[in-house]
Amino acid sequence: MDQFIKQDETGDLIETGMNVANHFLSAPIQGTNSLSKASIIPGVAPVLIGNPEQKNIQHPTASHQGSKSKGSGSGVRSIIVPPSEASNGGTQIPEPLFAQTGQGGIVTTVYQDPTIQPTGSYRSVELAKIGKERMINRFVEKPRTSTPVTEFKRGAGSRAQGQTIQEEGIDGNGASAGSKERSGSLSGATLYAHLSLPQQDSTPANVGIAPQSAISANEIMDLLRGMDARLQHLEQKVDKVLAQGSMVTQIKNELSTVKTTLATIEGMMATVKIMDPGNPTGVPVDELRRSFSDHVTIVSGPGDVPFSSSEEPTLYLDELARPVSKPRPAKQTKPQPVKDLAGRKVMITKMITDCVANPQMKQAFEQRLAKASTEDALNDIKKDIIRSAI
């Protein structure tokens, strides 16, 4: 039996694997419908997960690796199949699972008819594993030995890379841990990264439903909205306060104008000298003295009739027809109304302050004003003040 895999079979296996990978990557898989250990047919799991006891792939030894480093290897690894399986045609095992796509792009796991036992062999499983491994290693670049970083020069990259490849190799039977090296492409390409191989472990994984979103997220959003509303309210109030700034400035200007006007009025009142009504200011002294002399006063109009007729003697006849003078009724004097002298005293006090400059005369007028209790006395004091000012 041929122990090597033909190139056509390898290409078919790789193409089949790529189609399966694209199929599962293009369809969304939910957590509750994904494959788990419980959905695999008993007997297939040890083969699929690749237990170390059932691996039949023979890796090259140190001698083969040494020959490969010298250029004698062809890059194809050999496969050893147990003689019992080669002679008997393989052990019957269940076929791998089939996947069907249901409604909404959900992938569900189904089996063939349970009454019919599918046929297969470990050889087909081994071939599938080899194809999968080669397909993975196809995109993984082997680690290279570290080389000193040199300044990039055009045309020198290929020679440095060739020199690095010639230095590869392992001495002895130990496994090489590899080494890091700068990427061969110095034109700005992204550095390569090793592909993470799937972990082959027989421990089942617990599948559960993803936790729901946190309940407190709504409270946080409500707090943020409340803070935003309060901030907008404060901004509106600040805008209103700033809008009143012009009005405050206008009120200040008007208040300054009122103060200026009041000061002007107070100054004018301080310069006004309170004088008798009808007595003009700026009259010569001689003319004022002539006005105080005695002279005839003519009163126009009907005059006081009782005053003019009371002086004439009148005879009357009594009950005996004798002429007698009728006795005149006693003239009743009308009580003069009491006048408020407080206002006059205030006026005279102001006149003393403004018109009298001599302190002695001012003190004398103040004493007379304090003793005055009638209107005539106040009038005399006022006349004396006017004479002293002239």
From Swiss-Prot:
Gene transcribed to yield this protein: P/V
Biased composition annotated in UniProt, kind: Polar residues: 54-65
Gene3D superfamilies noted in UniProt: 1.20.5.300, DNA helicase RuvA subunit, C-terminal domain (1.10.8.10)
Modified residues (Phosphothreonine): 10, 16, 91, 150, 164, 249, 257, 281, 297, 374
UniProt keyword Protein transport present: no
Residues modified to Phosphoserine: 69, 187, 256, 291, 293, 300, 373
Source species of the chain: Mumps virus (strain SBL-1) (MuV)
Stored InterPro entries: P/V_Pprotein_paramyxoviral
Pfam families in the record: Paramyx_P_V_C
Functional description taken from the UniProt entry: Essential cofactor of the RNA polymerase L that plays a central role in the transcription and replication by forming the polymerase complex with RNA polymerase L and recruiting L to the genomic N-RNA template for RNA synthesis. Also plays a central role in the encapsidation of nascent RNA chains by forming the encapsidation complex with the nucleocapsid protein N (N-P complex). Acts as a chaperone for newly synthesized free N protein, so-called N0, allowing encapsidation of nascent RNA chains during replication.
The protein's name: Phosphoprotein
Domain notes: The N-terminus consists of a long intrinsically disordered tail. The central part contains the coiled-coil multimerization domain (MD or OD). Forms a four-stranded coiled coil structure. The C-terminus constitutes the alpha-helical X domain (XD) that binds to the nucleocapsid (N-RNA complex) and the L polymerase.
Key words, A-Z: Phosphoprotein, Viral RNA replication
CDD domains assigned: MEV_P-protein-C_like (cd21031)
Region (Disordered): 54-98, 144-183
Family: Belongs to the rubulavirus/avulavirus P protein family.
Complex and partners: Homotetramer. Interacts (via multimerization domain) with polymerase L; this interaction forms the polymerase L-P complex. Interacts (via N-terminus) with N0 (via Ncore); this interaction allows P to chaperon N0 to avoid N polymerization before encapsidation. Interacts (via C-terminus) with N-RNA template; this interaction positions the polymerase on the template for both transcription and replication. Interacts with host RPS6KB1 kinase; this interaction may play a role in the viral replication and transcription.
Span list, region Interaction with the nucleoprotein: 342-390
